[in-house]
A protein has these predicted regions:
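Active-site-proximal segments of metal-dependent phosphoesterases and phosphodiesterases across multiple
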Residues: 79-86, 120-153
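Acidic, His/Gly-rich catalytic cores of divalent-metal-dependent hydrolytic chemistry
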Residues: 170-173, 177, 185-251
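Active-site-proximal beta-strand elements of phosphoester/diester hydrolases
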Residues: 2-10, 122-130, 188-192
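Anionic-ligand binding region
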Residues: 140-171, 186-189
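Short acidic-hydrophobic surface loop/beta-edge motif
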Residues: 112-120, 169-172
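His/Asp/Glu-rich metal-coordinating catalytic cores
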Residues: 99, 106-109, 117, 123
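Active-site environment of divalent metal-dependent phosphoester hydrolases
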Residues: 10-15, 40-43, 64-69, 157-171, ...
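Core catalytic region of metal-dependent phosphoesterases/phosphodiesterases
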Residues: 2-97, 104
Length: 251
């Protein structure tokens, strides 16, 4: 089974369109999923929601969606840098002030996770971790952390985002408790970010996962799009120009 995953979109409709076109152009993709965090940092949150609905793209709820839809005081982004925290607050307040009821209803409707079986393997999709949707799961976490998350997810293949930095990791732990994973082992995939990459590559990112009984072939497609159009829209919307600078830099 071959699927495409669209990580954190964050109000960037131009990046979403480019990522979607790349996903549907990839041979034999059966399903496209999104990982939530639909608004923030760019001004097209409502257009993003409309696009996902129009194209029947299933997905999960991110911490940003939860916070915006339920009128929370902050996004739960947990920035340690005070300057970044201040910018995040400005983004969050702007998004709450400009989001439509249709968009908040859609965000509220999103599940915490999506689970299914593919090629005899249990797949689970969530925004950040199987426990919390605002915990950062970077690839430098130790093996015990990865195995702990696999136990909590009760899955062989886990797909998530939140960090905006893509990676794939595989583990072949002894059985039990991972006797259901079969010969394919455990696979952990961070799909990166469609709308706000933080790995130094400003192009949009779409993850293609080709699941077989033995393996998960994973590609991270990087697609150019009109970044300046979005950067200009950020500034014109009244959002801080800082977000436009970060978008251009892929940070």
């Amino acid at each position: 089974m071959k699927i495409a995953i669209l990580g954190d979109i964050h109000g960037n409709i131009e990046a979403l369109k480019a990522a979607y076109d790349a996903a549907v152009s990839s041979n034999n993709v059966e399903k496209i999923y999104h990982l939530g965090d639909l608004g923030g940092y760019a001004p097209f949150v409502n257009e993003v929601v409309d696009f996902l609905i129009e194209h029947a793209i299933e997905g999960v709820q991110g911490n940003y969606d939860d916070a915006v839809a339920n009128d929370k005081e902050h996004c739960g982004c947990k920035y340690e840098d005070p300057a970044q925290a201040e910018m995040a607050t400005m983004s969050f307040e702007w998004t709450k002030a400009n989001v439509t009821e249709k968009s908040t209803d859609y965000m509220k409707s999103l599940p915490f996770e999506i689970a299914f079986e593919a090629e005899g393997r249990r797949v689970k999709i969530f925004h950040a971790t199987p426990l919390k949707n605002n915990l950062y799961w970077h690839n430098d976490r130790d093996e015990d952390f990865f195995l702990h998350m696999a136990r909590k997810a009760d899955a062989d293949i886990m797909i998530y985002g939140h960090t905006h930095i893509p990676y794939r990791k595989k583990s072949n732990p002894p059985s039990p408790p991972f006797s259901k994973g079969g010969r394919g082992g455990l696979v952990f995939i961070n799909a990166g970010s469609v709308g706000k990459p933080k790995d130094g590559d400003a192009r949009t990112c779409v993850c293609i996962a080709d699941i077989t009984p033995d393996n998960v072939k994973t590609e991270f497609l990087r697609i150019p799009y009109d970044i300046e159009k979005v950067a200009s829209a950020i500034i014109e919307s009244g959002l801080p120009s800082y977000f436009a600078e970060k978008l251009r830099a892929g940070k």
